[in-house]
Structures are given as structure tokens and as C-alpha cells.
Amino acid sequence: MWSEGRYDYDRLPRERVPPRSHPSDGYHRVVNVVPKRPPLLDKRPPLLDKRPPLLARPDEGGYSRYYSHVDCRVCDEGRSFSHDRRSGPSHSGDESGYRWLRDDHSTSRQPDYRDMRDGFRRKSFYSSHYSRDRSPHKRDAPFFRESPVGRKDSPHSRSGSSVSSRSYSPERSRTHSFHQSQHRKSSRVGASYKRQNEAIRGRGKERSIQSVKTSRDASPSSSSAVASSKALDKPSRLTEKELAEAESKWANETLEKSDESNLAEMNEFEAGSTAPLFIDQTEEPESNTVDGTELYEDSQLSNRSKAIASKTKEIEQVYRQDCETFGMVVKMLIEKDPSLEKSVQFALRQNLHEIGERCVEELKRFITEYDNSARDFGDPF
């Protein structure tokens, strides 16, 4: 019993030779035998059918199965992570298909193998986009339904490729083409919008020139303006030549309408030019009366000032004459008696002062009389 057990475990290192005798390129002959990874519920794994001939023992039933599994495990552990990544699709089935592992092996070795296999499957093969779905059918559906090539032609189905499944997913290529089409549409819309803005800017400049030329003319009727605006506000499908023709046509229409409106206004002005004249003639007396009163008042003031000036001149003349006469009399008296000079001069000054006061009183009296006569003369108005 113990010898057989030791014989079993001693045979392990020698049986590692056949799996390592494969070519140096890293390809295993079992790789990609199952291209679609169906659920392995009732099937025996294809690895057991391909076991080496040295492990076949007819006298021990569970020995060949055990050593076949050990051979598979040793091959997986002996090779690098790149080999496990390349041979990942052969182990990526549902865990219910590996019932023979639970039946024939110890519980201590089974979780290690399953964790190692699941870890390699999650890290290497599936992308983060497909790691949410646990069902292998849902994961495989996009590759077989939407991919234009088969699974053998896809770059990540080969064992030696370093292309990730995310970079080759048809969803990504589809979104890329969708973004390209959106970019083309946006560039097309931007070009048409730019052409439309340029056309509108050109129309605005031409309209400003036309408006400067025809600013004194009357505006055309609303119907022609609406029709011309509809013809000019078409989308940018019109070429620049058509826009120029439309602008010239609109300018001609506006000139014709403005000429017609000018003729109508001239006729109206000629027809109604007589009425405002009569109205102005009827309104003239009021303005003339207002101006007449102002002129009358001004004339009265000027006449009053003229009368006062003339009266002052008369009073001055009289005053000078009196002064001259008194001066001659005093001079004659002083010549006769020089001692009377001081007394005569004092009397002369008093007389001259009295004559001046009389002249001022006479001027005031004249002004009051003149104002009273002017007030009496202006009452009838």
C-alpha cells in the first residue's frame, strides 16, 4: 500500500517530460480546440482524451484520471502567465462542467486550481465592459453576432497576441464610426452655417447702401417688402449669383415703389397746397395784433424818450441863457465896485441853484403830463 503510494508520487517528476517536449514557441496542442466555449455539463473535458500514452494504466481506473488532471495542472503551473492567458479560452466555461474535479480530488487542491483559473480569466481575457455578466452565453453573444470575422480571425483569439479584447471590440469600432459620422455631420452643418452668415452679412451691407441712397424716398408697401424678404431669407442653398440677382431685383422694386409714392405725394401736395395758404391768412391777424401791440408799446416808449430829450434840451437852453444874463450883470457890478465881488458871487450861486431846481421841476411836470396824455390816448384799444 505504501509502496504503491510512493510509486505514484515518484512517477510525477518523470511524467512532466512529455508536456515540456512541445515546440519552443509556447503553443499547446490543446489550444483553441473548443472555439465557442459551450457549457460543459454532460461532457468530459477534451483534455482527458488527449492524455499521453505513458499514463494509461489498465489495472488502475482512477489513476489515469488523476494523472491526467495532474498533468494539466502541472502544465498550467509550469508555464508562464502568457501561456495561461493564451490558453484561457479552453478553461472559460461554467464551473458546473467540472464536476469530475469535485468527485475525484481532495478539497484542499480544488479551490487553489479554481481560484488560479478564475483569476487568470478575469485579469487577462475579459475586459471590464464584459466582466459584469457571469453567463458565458451573454459574454460571447456580441463576438459571434456582430463581429464580421470568425473567432479564429479575431486578434485576441490567437494564443500569442497582445491585443486586448477592448481594443478589438466591435462596439468600439461602431462607436468610432458613429463619432466619425457625427463629426462629418457637424462639419457639414458648420460649413453651411458659415456660408449662410456670409450671405446674410453681404445682404446687410447691400441693404445699408440701398437705404442710404433711398433714405429720402418713402418706404415700399408691406406686401412687396414681405415678398422680397421671403425671397431673400431662403436657406443657404442659393448661390451667391442668385443672391446678387435677388438683391438687384429687390432694389429695382424699391426704386419703382419709391417713385410711385413720390408721385402720389407730389399730387397730394399740389392738390392740398391751397388750403394751408387760407389757413395761414386767417391766422395772420392774431399774430399781427400781438406784434402791433408790442410795436405800439415800443413806439410809445421811443416817443416818450424823444419828448423827454427834447424838453431837457429846451430847459438847458433856458438855464444857459439865465446863467449868461446873471453873469453879465455880476461882472458889470464887480467892474463898478470890486469890493462887492464876494457878496455878488455868493448871491449868483444861490440864484443859479434856484434856476436849476426850477428846470428840474419843470422837466418832471412835463413827464407826468406826457404820461397822462399817452394813457388817455391808449384807452380805446
Curated annotation (Swiss-Prot):
Record-listed cross-link Glycyl lysine isopeptide (Lys-Gly) (interchain with G-Cter in SUMO2), residues? K123, K194, K213, K241, K249, K342
Q: In which tissues is it expressed?
A: Ubiquitously expressed. Strong expression in the developing somites and limbs, the embryonic nervous system and the adult brain.
Q: Which GO terms describe its cellular component?
A: chromosome; cytoplasm; nucleoplasm
Q: How does it assemble?
A: Homodimer. Component of the HUSH complex; at least composed of TASOR, PPHLN1 and MPHOSPH8. Interacts with SIN3A and HDAC1. May interact with PPL.
UniProt modified residues of type Phosphoserine: S124, S128, S147, S154, S181, S211, S215, S219, S339
Q: Which Pfam families match?
A: Periphilin_C (PF25234)
Its biological function? Component of the HUSH complex, a multiprotein complex that mediates epigenetic repression. The HUSH complex is recruited to genomic loci rich in H3K9me3 and is probably required to maintain transcriptional silencing by promoting recruitment of SETDB1, a histone methyltransferase that mediates further deposition of H3K9me3. In the HUSH complex, contributes to the maintenance of the complex at chromatin. Acts as a transcriptional corepressor and regulates the cell cycle, probably via the HUSH complex.
Upper lineage is: Eukaryota, Metazoa, Chordata, Craniata, Vertebrata
Q: Quick one: where is this thing mainly located?
A: nucleus
Start and end residues of each stretch annotated as Disordered: 1-65, 79-260
Q: Where is the composition biased (Basic residues)?
A: 175-187
InterPro entries linked to this entry:
Pphln1 (IPR028851)
User: Where is the protein found, in the record's own terms?
Assistant: Nucleus; Cytoplasm; Chromosome
Mark out the compositionally biased spans (Low complexity).
157-168, 217-230
What the record says about disrupting the gene is: Embryonic lethality. Embryos die during early embryogenesis.
Cite a single GO BP annotation.
protein localization to heterochromatin
Q: Which UniProt keywords apply?
A: Acetylation, Chromosome, Cytoplasm, Isopeptide bond, Keratinization, Nucleus, Phosphoprotein, Repressor, Transcription, Transcription regulation, Ubl conjugation
Entry keyword annotation includes 4Fe-4S: no
Q: According to the UniProt entry, where does the motif Nuclear localization signal sit in this chain?
A: 117-123
Q: Which residues form the signal peptide?
A: none
- The UniProt gene name for this protein comes to Pphln1
Native source organism of the sequence: Mus musculus (Mouse)
Which residue windows does the record flag with biased composition (Basic and acidic residues)? Answer: 1-28, 39-65, 79-121, 130-156, 195-208, 231-260
For whether the record's keyword set contains Repressor, the answer is yes
N6-acetyllysine PTM positions? K249
Its name, as the record gives it, is Periphilin-1
